Every structure is written in C-alpha cells, then in structure tokens.
A protein has these predicted regions:
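Metallocofactor- and cofactor-centric catalytic cores in central/energy metabolism, strongly enriched
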Residues: 1-95, 108-146
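Active-site gating loops and adjacent loop-to-helix segments of metal-dependent hydrolytic enzymes
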Residues: 101
C-alpha cells in the first residue's frame, strides 16, 4: 500500500482535490493518505473532508492526521507539499510593495518581486522538509504545490 503524505494539509482546496484525484487511480485507491499541518483545527477539517471522500468513493484507503511532520514522513512513498509560510496577511506586502514601484502582481504569485518575497519565507521550511525526507523516506518523491 502506498503512503502519500500531505504537508500543509490544512490548505483545504489543494488537499481535497488532490486526494480525490489520487484515489481514482486503481493503483492508489488503497493508499494511506497521511495529513500533516501545524494548525490542528484546519488539519481536523481536512481529515474529515478526506474521510468523507474515502467513504463516498468506497475506497479502501486509510486517512491519518497529525501535527508531527517527522512522524508522518516515515516510510512515505510520495510527499505533496502545500505550505504557506507566514500568514495570509503577508500577501498584502507581496502585492503592495511592488505596486508602489509600478509592478502589478497576482495574489499568490511565484514570479517577480512577490515570488522572491515568498521564496525567502518558504525556502528555510522547504529545506527542513527535504532534510527530514532524506532521513525518513529517502526514496519518496516530492510534489511541491506551494
């Protein structure tokens, strides 16, 4: 059985859509879907949504959830990362600072000045995740949706 970890599982839109799509593949319909997020409330919401997807699709999948990233990475085959470093309130700075200098930016952009701001916030955490993966699931594939 494949183990697929979702780091930043509280990102409800990404998690729900990806889990639903993954479970439609015959090879993955019995996967362990392991959710992790630092926000317990959002994590529990995502867990319940994923459990509902499993139940409604009658998939033999297992859903687990924890706030301990290292615990959930043990033995993972794939890791989907959908993290947001910093709160959504920092996006205002990502948009307003470039706009002050005549550069229009999309919300959540990953290119241009806002992409640089976002990268500077995100890279340290991504490196921590990569180090954990090297130790705990070195064969796993990472898919970054951040």
């Amino acid at each position: 059985m494949a183990k697929i970890v979702f780091i930043g599982a509280g990102s409800f839109g990404f998690t729900r859509g990806l889990v639903r799509d993954i479970l439609t593949y015959p090879l993955l319909k019995g996967a362990e879907i392991a959710l992790v997020d630092i926000n317990r409330e959002r994590l529990n919401f995502a867990r319940r949504a994923c459990e509902k997807i499993v139940a409604m699709g009658n998939y033999p999948a297992k859903v687990t959830a924890t706030t301990d990233r290292r615990e959930v990475l043990k033995g993972a085959n794939a890791v989907c990362v959908t993290i947001l470093c910093g709160r959504t309130s920092v996006w205002g700075h990502d948009i307003l600072i470039p706009k002050k200098y005549g550069i229009d930016i999309n919300v959540g952009g990953t290119r241009g000045p806002s992409g640089i701001f976002r990268a500077l916030r995100t890279i340290p955490t991504m490196l921590e995740i990569c180090r954990d993966m090297e130790q705990l699931c070195p064969q796993a594939i990472m898919l970054n949706y951040t």
